[in-house]
């Protein structure tokens, strides 16, 4: 699945991704697959999966595409 980062607060370690087909999904820093400090920037295109979390659907296996 693809989407764009709506916002991400690196101090709090979470944010939201807007899915290409519509709707937002929660993303936690621990779901980001990259080396070093795991953070996202507004507008970045990402690929991800959706898993059921404690508080509902959330992004998993998040990879930056652009």
Curated annotation (Swiss-Prot):
Residues annotated as domain CSD: 3-62
Main location: cytoplasm
GO BP of this protein: regulation of gene expression
InterPro entries noted in UniProt: Cold_shock_CspA, Cold_shock_domain, CSD, CSD_CS, CSP_DNA-bd, NA-bd_OB-fold
GO cellular component: cytoplasm
Localization: Cytoplasm
SMART domains, per the entry: CSP
Keywords: Activator, Cytoplasm, DNA-binding, Transcription, Transcription regulation
A GO MF term: nucleic acid binding
Phenotypic consequence of residue 61 to N: No effect on thermal stability
Domain of life: Bacteria
Self-association and partners: Monomer.
PANTHER family: COLD SHOCK DOMAIN CONTAINING PROTEINS
Protein name: Cold shock-like protein
Originating species: Thermotoga maritima (strain ATCC 43589 / DSM 3109 / JCM 10099 / NBRC 100826 / MSB8)
Gene: csp
